[in-house]
Amino acid sequence: MTNSKLTETLTFECETGNYHTFCPISCVAWLYQKIEDSFFLVIGTKTCGYFLQNALGVMIFAEPRYAMAELEEADISAQLNDYKELKRLCLQIKQDRNPSVIVWIGTCTTEIIKMDLEGMAPRLEAEIQTPIVVARANGLDYAFTQGEDTVLAAMVQRCPSNAPEQNQIEKKSLVLFGSLPTNVATQLNLELERCGIQVAGWLPSQRYADLPVLNQNVYVCGINPFLSRTATTLMRRRKCKLISAPFPIGPDGTRAWLEKICSVFNVAPINLIERERLIWDSLEDYIALLRGKSVFFMGDNLLEISLARFLVRCGMIVYEIGIPYLDKRFQSAELQLLEKTCSEMNVAMPRIVEKPDNYNQIQRIRELQPDLAITGMAHANPLEARGINTKWSVEFTFAQIHGFTNARDILELVTRPLRRNKALENLGWNQLVKM
């Protein structure tokens, strides 16, 4: 293994570490809220049910639009008929909720016992007259955010190839893919409208009936780094053209994202440089806290490279970017922007470690003593006990971090542990955090 010092070029390493991360079935938490007329049925064991209840904070009276189909010993030993059981559950769901689409989420157990969900779904769909989408968002993936990637890739197959009114199809139309809160998606739509580009649709759409038209005339662009499987499906199955752009995280990433889309559509971007400068000026109070500080990404949700690039632009030094999985083709534009940002800020390039070994990472953190470690929840308390400031990476997944106006939310999350410890020191309580 190379030493932990910084280098002048991006270096890529691959270790064989443990995947201390959430299960991908957690994607249900935000997708059922995004697709308003959907119902998610997770097919798994008691463990999956406990995870959904505890990790997602299910409220008894809220009646969320997802449920657990719990596999028992009789299911696993093939004593029960899977088709009949799933039919009974889906009929009950249709009667109680009447969703426009039912999404079956396969888990590790359905994978291990070779449950033929893809074979049963079309038969049952024809019988109950409700679309059934199958997504194997199991724990065999690299990161929990890839659960959304699996669901969206399955949704691609259900998108129409042609609009009802053919004459309204433009020669080139734009579809954005990735799940965002409605207000953030509206912000990005408005940014593109200011540049003279109309967004034809989003994947996923708020309603199943509003899924976008996908064909060879459609340009698609992702808004999250963990959607490589969806991008591949869009290109191979629906012949869409992928716009390879940095992701709209931070003012710099949002500007680069908009500029790349504008260049593809032969449109001159309007006042983007000035708009980015105004946003940076408004963030100066946070940036002053971060300038010259160091950060270490342990790797958890595949947002690491985009966040690291933004924090470098804020004046931070990034020692290492741990990432559970890196698709260099899908993130090529982001990697180029990271390299360019480090060069412009005159800081050493961080090394990127794919599938990091957590034990080795702890040793490197002990050597480097970063001001902040962005880590999964499993390592946060042990690092805090050793005097390292930490931030849970899962918070960035659920926070609104896309677009110009939400850059402040990213910095609010990043600076919170630094501000907290400074406040404790001012009170004379610094002995509590330095063991």
From Swiss-Prot:
GO biological process terms on file: light-independent chlorophyll biosynthetic process; photosynthesis, dark reaction
Subcellular location(s) per record: Plastid, Chloroplast
Principal location: plastid
Entry annotated with the keyword GTP-binding: no
Pfam families referenced in this protein's UniProt entry, alphabetically: Oxidored_nitro (PF00148)
Cofactor(s) required, per the database record: [4Fe-4S] cluster
InterPro entries hit by this protein: LIPOR_BchN/ChlN (IPR050293), Nase/OxRdtase_comp1 (IPR000510), Protochl_reductN (IPR005970)
UniProt superkingdom: Eukaryota
SUPFAM superfamilies, alphabetized: Helical backbone' metal receptor
Sorted UniProt keywords: 4Fe-4S, ATP-binding, Chlorophyll biosynthesis, Chloroplast, Iron, Iron-sulfur, Metal-binding, Nucleotide-binding, Oxidoreductase, Photosynthesis, Plastid
GO cellular component, one term: chloroplast
Pathway stated in the Swiss-Prot or TrEMBL entry: Porphyrin-containing compound metabolism; chlorophyll biosynthesis (light-independent)
Keyword rRNA-binding recorded: no
Cofactor binding, note field: Binds 1 [4Fe-4S] cluster per heterodimer. The cluster is bound at the heterodimer interface by residues from both subunits.
Catalytic activity: chlorophyllide a + oxidized 2[4Fe-4S]-[ferredoxin] + 2 ADP + 2 phosphate = protochlorophyllide a + reduced 2[4Fe-4S]-[ferredoxin] + 2 ATP + 2 H2O
GO terms of molecular function: 4 iron, 4 sulfur cluster binding; ATP binding; metal ion binding; oxidoreductase activity, acting on iron-sulfur proteins as donors; oxidoreductase activity, acting on the CH-CH group of donors, iron-sulfur protein as acceptor
Listed EC numbers: 1.3.7.7
Biological function: Component of the dark-operative protochlorophyllide reductase (DPOR) that uses Mg-ATP and reduced ferredoxin to reduce ring D of protochlorophyllide (Pchlide) to form chlorophyllide a (Chlide). This reaction is light-independent. The NB-protein (ChlN-ChlB) is the catalytic component of the complex.
Subunit and interaction comment: Protochlorophyllide reductase is composed of three subunits; ChlL, ChlN and ChlB. Forms a heterotetramer of two ChlB and two ChlN subunits.
PANTHER family found in the cross-reference section: LIGHT-INDEPENDENT PROTOCHLOROPHYLLIDE REDUCTASE SUBUNIT N
Name of the protein: Light-independent protochlorophyllide reductase subunit N
Species of the source: Auxenochlorella protothecoides (Green microalga)
